[in-house]
């Protein structure tokens, strides 16, 4: 687990880095009723303009009323979508924050485990060094005792 996954990794691109068409597609996917309302309002305005040109005042008035109603519906869809998207975005943000905190906790625990293992390794090295130095001391002591034994044997054999 040498690399912890980041909560920022993913295919989502920042809105500021998107092109115009990508932004338009992104926002249309967020609030699909707004583009439909805009399109319906545009159609109502075009039909009203055609009827004004042809002199049909009643149909022109009807389409202008449709335009006002569709514009109002589009605004309601925009406000409702913003409210819903804002709420879901806050929830998503809180989930992302929780994931970030969890990743930080994992990283902290991982670092603590590495430090603990490093301390164990250092302790083993110290023990091994102490054991080597103790073995060396014992070897020197053994050599000294052997020399002393030879000296004593030499004395006892020369005194006979």
Curated annotation (Swiss-Prot):
Keywords: Coiled coil, Membrane, Mitochondrion, Transmembrane, Transmembrane helix
Membrane-spanning intervals of the chain: 33-50, 63-85
Coiled-coil intervals, chain numbering: 86-160
Residue ranges constituting the HIG1 domain according to the UniProt record: 5-96
Membrane topology, record value: Multi-pass membrane protein
Gene Ontology BP, a term: mitochondrial respirasome assembly
Region: Disordered, residue numbers: 135-160
GO cellular component: mitochondrial membrane
PANTHER family listed in its UniProt record: HIG1 DOMAIN FAMILY MEMBER 1A (PTHR12297:SF3), HYPOXIA-INDUCBILE GENE 1 HIG1 -RELATED (PTHR12297)
Subunit text: Associates with the respiratory chain complex III/complex IV supercomplex.
Protein name from the UniProt record: Respiratory supercomplex factor 1, mitochondrial
Species, as recorded: Lachancea thermotolerans (strain ATCC 56472 / CBS 6340 / NRRL Y-8284)
Taxonomic classification: Eukaryota, Fungi, Dikarya, Ascomycota, Saccharomycotina
Gene assigned in the entry: RCF1
């Amino acid at each position: 687990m040498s690399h912890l996954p980041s909560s920022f990794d993913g295919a989502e691109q920042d809105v500021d880095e998107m092109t115009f068409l990508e932004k338009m597609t992104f926002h249309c996917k967020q609030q699909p009723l707004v583009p439909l309302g805009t399109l319906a309002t545009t159609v109502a305005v075009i039909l009203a303009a055609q009827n004004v040109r042809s002199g049909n005042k009643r149909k022109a008035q009807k389409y202008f009323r449709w335009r006002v109603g569709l514009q109002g519906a589009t605004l309601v869809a925009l406000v409702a979508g913003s409210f819903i998207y804002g709420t879901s975005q806050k929830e998503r943000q809180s989930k992302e924050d929780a994931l970030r905190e969890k990743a930080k906790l994992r990283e902290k625990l991982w670092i603590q485990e590495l430090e603990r293992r490093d301390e164990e390794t250092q302790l083993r090295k110290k023990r091994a060094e102490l054991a080597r130095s103790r073995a060396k001391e014992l070897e020197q002591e053994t050599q000294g005792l052997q020399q002393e034994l030879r000296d004593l044997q030499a004395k006892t054999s020369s005194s006979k």
